[in-house]
Amino acid sequence: MTIKGRRLSVWVAAVAFTITVAALTGPRQPGAASVEDVAMMKSADRQKMLIEGAKKEGKITWYTTLIVDQVVRPVKEAFEKEYPFIQIDFYRGNAENLVRRMLAEYQAKRYDVDLIDGTVSPVMVQRAGLLQRFYSPFFAEYPAELKDSQGFWGSTNLYFLTPGYNTRMVKLNELPKTYQDLLNPRWKGQMMWSTSRGSGAPIFIGNVLMSMGQEAGKAYLQKLKGQNIAKSTASNRQILDLTIAGEFPIALHIFNHHAYISKTAGAPVDWYAIEPVTATIQTIALAKSTPHPHASMLLLDFVLSEKGQKVFQQSNYLPAHPKVPAKQADLKLGGGRFSKALYMTPDLQFDKGNEWVDYFQNQFLK
């Protein structure tokens, strides 16, 4: 199935499901606070009430797209040390898998999931009516682009997409430094990118169209098309590995922290910025019928706090919190190597993603 087809199949299911979602709210114990009451709590004794409720609940189920050994387990260990009366269970999958799983569970009136994360998946289930707005005192520490205006999601970490290059094949001072420089005949047939919807060519196209404007952006992309960029369905990580192996000197759009990790391991690779850099956001959200709302709110507060964000930092993820730098500081916006980034928010990717995929398929794959 194509990247567009996969995306649409989930959306069609979500739309159909919206018709009945109002009737599929989970059961609550008589006299118990509603999920909304707990999620939106702002009283002075909020922390005390969350802890009291969480002790009765005892667990959380977290659906995640994050790498388990790199960051999920460290977050679990740090949180359970802070709150030893709560156990985190997690299920790891890609975005489509998590969305399908959650939709199927709600259709079956089985309410297992408490939290769901991803760059787009929370918005997908939000549009199906399956998320609960929530309040966290830590929202105040984040800029507008890193939190949902209605309170449906917060941010745990960031991804910055930049070119990566083989340091044995090309020197830093020879690299194309701007989008216009990519059109230099020298780079024809010398670049490679992934067809991945959320991190490859389509989102690169989205950056160009948004930063240059539709008319100028499409004119530019027509010229870029003539550069014969090699395309692969491989992940961005695999594209970078091919660059390290010498298949192409430049990987056009990869996660900069992947290049850093490989470089520190001794690989002949580095990254550099063409501004504005494409940025995507890992978000986390609360399920509408979470069976463990008190415990879930404690975990949401934890991952949004500076303390929780430092777990992401030590796991070589790029923390979303403005006051928590990356372990390698220059990987983040404002860390010294780039100063302009275009944030592709989950809503923006959801609303414009098909348009960018269509353009890529019609102009670069034919």
Model-derived segments and spans:
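A bilobed periplasmic-binding-protein/Venus flytrap-type ligand-binding module shared by bacterial periplasmic
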Residues: 162-169, 205-210, 280-293, 303, ...
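Extracytoplasmic "Venus flytrap"
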Residues: 35-47, 55-74, 199, 282
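Extracellular/periplasmic bilobal clamshell ligand-binding domains
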Residues: 329-366
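Periplasmic-binding protein-like
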Residues: 144, 158-161, 187-197, 220-226, 230-233, 303-326, ...
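Short, low-complexity disordered leader/linker segments with a strong preference
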Residues: 1-57, 366
